[in-house]
Structure formats: C-alpha cells, structure tokens
Amino acid sequence: MEKPVIILSCDVNERDRMRMRQEYFEAVIEAGGVPVVMPPLMLRSQIDEWLDRIDADALMLTGGCDIDPQTFRETPVRGLGRVSLQRDVYELGLLEACMLRGMPVLGICRGLQVINVALGGSLYQDILSQMGTEFARHQQKEPTEVATHEVAFIAGSMAENLFQTQFLPTNSHHHQCVHRVADDLTVSGTTVDGVVEALEWPEREIFAVQFHPERMRDGNPTMCGFFKNWIERVAAVASTKKSEIAKND
C-alpha cells in the first residue's frame, strides 16, 4: 500500500516566518506517512490550486498560539494570549478545502480548537478566568513528555480505538479549550474537571485531541501506536477512494 501524504499546517510568528516543531513530521514519518508542510496561503483559490497539485490524503492541524475570538464572534477577555488572525484565516480555509475533498483530518491542541470553531463551536478564551477550574493541570511546567493529567475516552469511540485504551495519561499545554461544541462533533474524551480533550466526527474521519501525543512518543508505545493507527485509517480511506475512481473511469 502506498504511503499516504499528510498535509501539515505551520505556524507563523511575529517576524512572518513559517515554523514547525519537528515532532509533527517525525511522528508522521515514523508511522508510515509522508509529511508535506503547507505554506500559509491566504486566498482560497491558492489553497485549492496547491491541493490539486499535491494530491494529499489527509490533513493534520498542528498546535500553536491562541485563536482570535473574532473567529467565533466574541470580544477578547483578560487572559487571552498571542493570536494570529493570519494563521486563523489560513487554517480555516485549508480545513474547509480539505473537508470538501473528503480528506481525513487530525487536529492537535490548537488544531482541535480550529476544527470546533470552523464547524460552528466556540472556545473558552482562558480556562482559569472563564471556566474557573484549577483541578486538572492544563499548562504544565514539567517537561513536555511528562504526563500531568489523565484523559478518559468514551467506550467504543474513535479515541478509544486509535489509542487502544479508555484511560490515557497525557501532557497538557493550553489555556483555551472548547466551550460550545459544534453540532457535528462528539466529545469523546475529557479530564476530571470537564475540559474537552478529544472531539470526533467518525463519518467524516475527523478526530482531534487537546494534548500533544507527538511529544510523548519516546518510549511510549501507546502514543506511537496512535499515529500508526491513524495513518492506517488514512491509507484505507485513500485506497477506497482510488478504487472508486478506477471503477468510474
């Protein structure tokens, strides 16, 4: 079976430079995929042209800065961190284009939030001031590979299937989180304080987590297995699409 091509969204910093933590593309390569980083194109026509040329199989929305609250029709609150409207526009356009092509999507941390906002949901801009929870630790100071809280997955969900467990110790690096869940998405993972840690739309092969599995792969077969399982699902979807195209030719 051909290795699936995975689009990775990138970050844009204050100096207008593209950047990405290497764990994202390393995780894809180790799991049997081919990563391709997409530049921050702003026009939908440019995104469509790029996708037509690349012929990718799936999209991974990576982590990064806060999401500008104007994207979900709210005004900023005290505690909001750095935002990048440029990145918001780029990723929202990219997600829409990939979904129209029926591509599987994986969101990580900020990526989960982008998916929820794109589909009509909203966010708590700052967990501490708006949600009032300090029980679970969501902005850890420990090394990123260290688990600081546990996520409970719904039995029979994509989350449980991909991670092959119902209870998963994870890291945590966020202060925004899901508030109103988009209608098409299902919450499949939470922490004990009620913070949403996994969202999914199985019929569209859309899955997202609030934590960073890519940073916990070293010596952790569960996190490595997650990426392998996801890449296998992507490859299966791509194979089915190609078979259908061949039948119609």
What is each residue range found by the language model?
Residues 1-106, 116-117, 124, 128-160, ...:
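N-terminal beta1-alpha1 cap of cysteine-dependent amidohydrolase-like domains
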Residues 176:
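Alpha/beta catalytic cores of group-transfer enzymes, especially the acyltransferase/condensing modules
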